[in-house]
Amino acid sequence: MNGIGINKISTNPVTDKLRSGRPSVGTWLSLCSPVSAENMAGVGWDWLVVDAEHSPVGFDTMVNCFRAIQLGGAVPMARVPWNDTIWMQRTLDAGAMGLVVPMINTAQDAKKVVSNMKYATKGIRSWGSSRVAAYIDNDYRTWTEENLAIIVMIETAQAVENAEEILSVEGVVGCFIGPADLALSMEAKDIGPGTEHEAAMLEVLKVAKKVGKAAGKHCGSGEEVSMRIAQGFQFLALSSDAGLMGKAAREEFDAIDFTGGSDNSKGKAEGKIY
């Protein structure tokens, strides 16, 4: 253990699970809040992804989210805005133990992802101070060679067509399907069982299994996560901190009887304060 009582990290639990064929479930953080990150980390997720693509999160906030995630026992990850060397380098230096990289359409795109995340001679990531290095039970550079979770997003019709070549790129741990952008790319009017959209996602899963990589996607409910695990998907995101908070708030708000005529108080106010 280090000076503040956090166990040293020997491997990455996310890459360990994905490479062994097991499911790994987490959620997206889009509220740009270390407090939310800390709260979510205690739920039991394997990982939490700070969404830097579709939220206004800044680097100062991101690094504090990573700290909160780590203290809560989950693996800190991020979705970067683009396959950009500087963005990816800074996010890894800030403490991410894996990245989800959007809009990967070709094998060449995937090779660039790996290069951006690897040090020489396997990549172009520049050496600099990385705050997570203090928590690694090994040389950080050596640790990154096998343990960074390198997840590419397949979210266009072109990417589905090129999925085998993309996932065959050395260093890529798995893929994450963006169902909404995929539907837009396919001009899909319907989604769900029996649709072309569903068939495309299952084709990506089939290809991933063929080349020995993990496939994943964003899910709207725990029931869908269970269904996707049964299908063979591994890297699965359940909603987001904002989505889960909103859902819980709506459910409780809808349960309020504003007429004052309901006698539903028995047992409802009982429980522990602490």
What are these regions (language model features)?
Residues 1-274:
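Expand to "…catalyze enediolate/carbanion chemistry for C-C bond making/breaking, isomerization
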